[in-house]
Amino acid sequence: MLRTYLTVIPLQGRSDLEQMVYAREGSVPPQATRFPIVQVIRDTLAPGDTAQVLTIRQENADTARSYQLLLEELAGLGIPESSVTQLTLPENQHADTLVRLCRDVADALPQITRVYACITYGTKSIPVVTLAALTCAEATHTELEVGGIYYGEVKRRDGRTESASLNDVTVLYQLSGLVGGVRDSTTAEEVFRQLVWISEHREG
């Protein structure tokens, strides 16, 4: 199976991008990483699978350094740089920039694949663009399935890291897809019942 992993390169400087152990319920024992998507890859990539990584990077010196750090971690998993695609954009929040990014992400996704996306890093607008691109690709691609949406959460107290966890937030993506069916349902409760059923029967 071709598994595609979509992530955003963090804006933090190198000194602020520390390695974390992102705990995840039901996963293989987590290992320290700067990038939650690396833990997702460890959890989902099976023998015989092919991995492709798409990265969204706003162009500046910090993201260029962080991109190299990601390549190093991916190489440790046996994923070469030739399997990684950069989607770059300027450091602005202009509507045309974000619309272009949405199109670029959808175009870069393979026609037949299972996609896993990490929405931890980047400006607040980029997760919105990411989810919109996935919705578009699911509708237009031959056989594209969203396997999971993840968010890496770090809890701190008094400036010190207490814990880090990898949260599966796929249910929120599924909710956005079901909302369009509210008009055809007697009550919104029917939509949420569908959502619960889907989340309980989702493949990994």
Where do the model's predicted regions map?
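Long, low-complexity, Lys/Arg-enriched
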Residues: 1-114, 135-204
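Detector for conserved single-position "signature" residues within domains
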Residues: 117
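Short Gly/Thr/Asp-enriched flexible loops that form oxyanion-binding sites at enzyme active sites
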Residues: 124-139
